[in-house]
Amino acid sequence: MRIAILGGTYNPIHIGHIFLAKEIEFLLNIDKVIFIPTCNPAHKLISEDVTVQNRIDMLKLALENENKILIDDCDIINGGITYTVDTISCVKKKYKNDKLFLVIGDDLFQNFDSWKDPQSIVSSVDLVVAHRIYKERLKSSFKHIYIDNKIIPISSSEIRNRIANGLPVSYLLPCSVLKYIKDNNLYVKKVNICERI
């Protein structure tokens, strides 16, 4: 099988993530796409207001009707700081005989040389770069494949900010995820009592 790996915080998962998974399926003739939520990513902080379980629940809701998309919680189970090279090692043990593709956005690719053991990553899997910010292709000495995907200008941080400021997000998220966010009061601004006086 041809399997694409999409790692991320998914805080929250949004239609841009799902659209990219569908694009990858089509452009690379992928049999399965695996979403891997990170535990504690090395390159960003996750607010303690949203739990790992919240993020996994939202992934499950968003992807419940997608038969070619799976969720793997290997990074969550391993705990600690998440490094992609370790994630790849874990996934390779499960899918020994399959061809693996690691998909990252060009925003991450521009600093790929600063990742932990990048050479080991590109030796283990095919590195796929998706357009996220830049329309042009970035150059790198690391072996990689660029896909000509459509850029969907949505980010999880933008969604969190919009929710915190009471702005609409219904067109950016699957309905089930939006309902979960509302039901669990996620991403809302915490108002200090002193600010009300």
From Swiss-Prot:
SUPFAM superfamilies with a match to the protein in the record: Nucleotidylyl transferase
Pfam families (UniProt xref): CTP_transf_like
Reaction(s) this enzyme catalyzes, per UniProt: nicotinate beta-D-ribonucleotide + ATP + H(+) = deamido-NAD(+) + diphosphate
Keyword entries, A-Z: ATP-binding, NAD, Nucleotide-binding, Nucleotidyltransferase, Pyridine nucleotide biosynthesis, Transferase
Annotated pathway: Cofactor biosynthesis; NAD(+) biosynthesis; deamido-NAD(+) from nicotinate D-ribonucleotide: step 1/1
Keyword Amino-acid biosynthesis included in the entry's annotation: no
Enzyme class: transferase
Molecular function, one GO term: nicotinate-nucleotide adenylyltransferase activity
One Gene Ontology biological process: NAD biosynthetic process
Keyword Electron transport among record annotations: no
UniProt cross-references to InterPro entries, sorted A to Z: Cyt_trans-like (IPR004821), NadD/NMNAT (IPR005248), Rossmann-like_a/b/a_fold (IPR014729)
EC number: 2.7.7.18
Recorded family membership: Belongs to the NadD family.
PANTHER family with a match to the protein in the record: NICOTINATE-NUCLEOTIDE ADENYLYLTRANSFERASE-RELATED, PHOSPHOPANTETHEINE ADENYLYLTRANSFERASE
HAMAP family: NaMN_adenylyltr
Function: Catalyzes the reversible adenylation of nicotinate mononucleotide (NaMN) to nicotinic acid adenine dinucleotide (NaAD).
Protein name: Probable nicotinate-nucleotide adenylyltransferase
Species: Borrelia garinii subsp. bavariensis (strain ATCC BAA-2496 / DSM 23469 / PBi)
Gene name of the encoded protein: nadD
